[in-house]
């Protein structure tokens, strides 16, 4: 199994490389690419960690050597959010970066599963889909927006609030990956009883957690370490699925279009990527209202990505 990380010299990419070197199955290959000349050094650095994962690093304008033979491609390249910016401000820079990298994926490893980390994910996944479609290689089972950060934040905040064991707390998070499009299904958390006064502020905290980190870093970047952990968790689930294990994760994929063309929901992963899109389950009145209210925003985010490629 070969996993390529594009954007491997950045704050997310370096931490992600470390986690994958530690956690990928023995015999895996880890390929690190970034435009920055430091990238082969990042690879040399993590290669000294004693695990049976082979690491290579590539720098420069062309990611082709890093992508050859890749089964999974994780894209974290792009600029980070600064105070006062929202994820849509990132669009102007990151849209072009994602488009260019996906054009290379389409040429070099068109059958790879691709996980998009670069924000704004609601839009960059749509960009990736349209680029792959133009190249004639789009398989909706193999393109994912990595929304796992919303899930790990939800698990952390819920377990703190309800005094639960974090490792055993699971919170489905549906919708998208910014602001009001992030919807944690708190009503589905086992062993947690809720009153109405708790739900709205906790939902808002989960939705705004990225801003919490951006402001706390005081201009020094956005969430990198927690994002890397979230991306590693998703990538490892994807690898397990590709190896034939039965794994369920919430992720932002093209499904049946009931809510929007792309929508984050529970998905069964398997040998072809998405094996099955699972139902949302029962929603509380608060959740149903929040779902209905987000859709216009989510659809507009998606349309922005489609237009970027097709204009």
Curated annotation (Swiss-Prot):
Substrate binds at residues 81, 87, 119, 153. This is Malate dehydrogenase. The gene is mdh. Keywords: NAD, Oxidoreductase, Tricarboxylic acid cycle. The lineage of its organism: Bacteria, Pseudomonadati, Pseudomonadota, Gammaproteobacteria, Pasteurellales. The keyword Oxidoreductase applies. It catalyses: (S)-malate + NAD(+) = oxaloacetate + NADH + H(+). Pfam families: Ldh_1_C, Ldh_1_N. It comes from the Bacteria. Belongs to the LDH/MDH superfamily. MDH type 1 family. One of its GO terms (biological process) is malate metabolic process. Homodimer. GO terms for molecular function: L-malate dehydrogenase (NAD+) activity.
């Amino acid at each position: 199994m070969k996993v390529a990380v594009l954007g491997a010299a950045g704050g997310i990419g370096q931490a992600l490389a470390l986690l994958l070197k530690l956690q990928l199955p023995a015999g895996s290959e880890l390929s690190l690419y970034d435009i920055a000349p430091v990238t082969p050094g990042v690879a040399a650095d993590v290669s000294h960690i004693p695990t049976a994962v082979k690491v290579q690093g590539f720098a420069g304008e062309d990611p082709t050597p890093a992508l050859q033979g890749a089964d999974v491609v994780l894209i974290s390249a792009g600029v980070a959010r600064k105070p006062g910016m929202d994820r849509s401000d990132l669009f102007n820079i990151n849209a072009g970066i994602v488009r260019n990298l996906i054009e290379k994926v389409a040429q070099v490893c068109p059958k790879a599963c691709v996980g998009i980390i670069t924000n704004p994910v609601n839009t960059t996944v749509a960009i990736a889909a349209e680029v792959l479609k133009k190249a004639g290689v789009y398989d909706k089972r193999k393109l994912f927006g990595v929304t796992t950060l919303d899930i790990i934040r939800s698990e952390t905040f819920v377990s703190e609030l309800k005094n639960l064991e974090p490792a055993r707390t699971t919170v489905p998070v549906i919708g998208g990956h910014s602001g009001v499009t992030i919807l944690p299904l708190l009503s589905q958390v086992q062993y947690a009883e809720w009153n109405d006064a708790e739900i709205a502020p906790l939902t808002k905290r989960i939705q705004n957690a990225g801003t919490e980190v951006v402001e706390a870093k005081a201009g020094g970047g956005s969430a990198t370490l927690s994002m890397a952990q979230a991306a590693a968790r998703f990538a490892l689930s994807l690898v397990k699925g590709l190896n034939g294990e039965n794994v369920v994760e919430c992720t932002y994929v093209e499904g049946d279009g009931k809510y929007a063309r792309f929508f984050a929901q529970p998905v069964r992963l398997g040998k072809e990527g998405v094996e099955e899109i699972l139902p949302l389950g029962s929603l509380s009145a608060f959740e149903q209202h929040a779902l209905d209210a987000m859709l216009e925003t989510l659809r507009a985010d998606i349309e922005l990505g489609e237009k970027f490629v097709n204009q």
